[in-house]
UniProtKB/Swiss-Prot annotation:
Disulfide bonds: none annotated. Consists of two distinct domains, a catalytic core and a N-terminal extension that is involved in tRNA binding. The keyword Aminoacyl-tRNA synthetase applies. Homodimer. The tRNA molecule binds across the dimer. It catalyses: tRNA(Ser) + L-serine + ATP = L-seryl-tRNA(Ser) + AMP + diphosphate + H(+); tRNA(Sec) + L-serine + ATP = L-seryl-tRNA(Sec) + AMP + diphosphate + H(+). It comes from Prochlorococcus marinus (strain NATL1A). GO terms for cellular component: cytoplasm. This is Serine--tRNA ligase. Belongs to the class-II aminoacyl-tRNA synthetase family. Type-1 seryl-tRNA synthetase subfamily. NCBIfam families: serS. Its main location: cytoplasm. L-serine binds at T233, A234, E235, E287, S386.
Length: 426
């Protein structure tokens, strides 16, 4: 959530940040709400001061011997009660305006960091580095073709069970999925992450706190009879793991790793990636999440990105690192690096991880704080990154490991988990 103080004191900074995202927002109504709230607060404080003064005057007069039921005391109490009613009316006005203001502010994305990479869309993103040697060739198959030939899954029966964009994994694919999850968790735990297994259902406050609501309501699956939603990413429940808390500074950074099933309606992707594991309504993911101090979050983004990269390196999968421009940033992010893995069958790089520094954006929405060096409460910073998306990782392994005899060579790092170095046709 954007800081209301910034909205009052430096609206031009907000306008510039939103314009760099391609948004031309009229902040006038929001500024008026802020001014009205400030005026009402001053009026309420003045009335409360008058009320306190009357209360003291009543006490003094009673001490001086004036009877409780005297006309003077009664008049003062009537005046005090009138002030209380006025204060109550003002508080209701403040609540109403504050709700309207919050509704609109919640729809505004995070502001890009200073000196961000400017740009309108993904075409303006910047490649920072590459790792590994991408293979290529006209005979290389896409992962969904390989999976069909090896009988690794069934999407047709899955559409009977649920609908399109679901898959059921069988035998080696199911085992490979489980192996990848355990491998990734173990790798990150060795790097100092604390494993958590959060709920797959979250409430509206959790989705609002992380920034998924209200903007992405149409992208999420919602329960009909409860205030619960299927989580689109473990980022949501982990953000709310400390909602409303003050985390001691000496505990920071808090580094969590979580496996979770993720659910997305993919409402805006009709006709895209209809085959395979790239874009499903349900998929598994290992998520990395940091709570950090404000002054260390820039370095934390570099580290969380490096930790996500280490998975690809261990799995011997070529990839590149992309810095997103301002026009391509996610809603809650102020800076993001995407990791794109090479898919030789498709002859393209595809996003497999997105690592973001959200600054205090989620912390403000979720009221998560820490102490500064002067013991004053301040908002901390949050960061997240996929470490990695399991289905897309499997797709990359199938495509990069394919052999001329139809078998799939598996990365050495997976052998202790999978129990074999190959997937063989049966």
């Amino acid at each position: 959530m954007i800081d209301q103080r910034l909205l009052r004191e430096n609206p031009n900074l907000i306008s510039e940040g939103l314009k760099s995202r391609g948004m031309d927002v009229d902040l006038g109504p929001l500024q008026k709400f802020c001014k009205d709230l400030k005026d009402l607060e001053e009026k309420r404080n003045s009335l409360q001061a008058q009320g306190n003064s009357i209360g003291k005057e009543v006490g003094q007069k009673i001490k001086q011997g004036l009877p409780h039921d005297s006309e003077e005391i009664s008049n003062l109490r009537v005046k005090g009660n009138q002030i209380k009613k006025q204060v109550g009316i003002i508080e209701e006005e403040e609540k109403s305006i504050s709700n309207k203001l919050n509704e609109q502010i919640l729809c505004l994305p995070n502001l890009p960091e200073k000196n961000s990479l400017e740009g309108k869309n993904e075409k303006d993103n910047k490649e920072l580095r590459r790792w590994g040697e991408p293979i290529s060739g006209n005979t290389l198959k896409e992962h969904w073709e390989i999976a069909n030939q090896l009988n690794l899954w069934d999407s047709e029966r899955s559409s009977v069970i649920a609908k399109s964009r679901f898959v059921t994994l069988f035998k080696h694919a199911a085992k490979l999925e489980r192996s990848l999850i355990n491998f990734m968790l173990d790798l990150h735990i060795k790097k100092g992450y604390l494993e958590v297994l959060p709920p797959a259902l979250v409430n509206t406050a959790s989705l609002t706190g992380s920034g998924q609501l209200p903007k992405f309501a149409e992208e999420s699956f919602r329960c009909a009879d409860d205030d619960l939603w299927l989580t689109p990413t473990a980022e949501v429940p982990i953000t709310s793991l400390h909602r409303g808390e003050i985390i001691p500074r000496d505990l920071l950074p808090l580094k969590y790793v979580a496996y979770s099933p993720c659910f997305r309606r993919e409402a805006g992707s009709y006709g895209r990636d209809t085959r395979g594991l790239i874009r499903l309504h349900q998929f598994n993911k290992v998520e990395l999440y940091w709570f950090s101090t404000p002054e260390t979050s820039e370095d934390a983004l570099e580290q969380i990105t490096s930790d996500a990269e280490s998975v690809l390196q261990e799995l011997e999968l070529p990839y590149r690192v992309i810095q997103l421009c301002t026009g391509d940033l996610g809603f809650s992010a102020k800076k993001t690096y995407d990791l794109e893995v090479w898919l030789p069958g498709a002859n393209t790089f595809r996003e497999i991880s997105s690592c973001s520094n959200c600054g205090d954006f989620q912390a403000r929405r979720s009221s998560i704080r820490t102490k500064d060096n002067n013991k004053k409460n301040i908002l901390l910073h949050t960061l997240n990154g996929s470490g990695l998306a399991i289905g897309r990782t499997m797709a990359a392994i199938l495509e990069n490991g394919q052999q001329s005899d139809g078998s799939i060579n598996l990365p050495k790092a997976l052998i202790p988990y999978f129990g074999s170095n190959k997937l063989q046709p049966e």
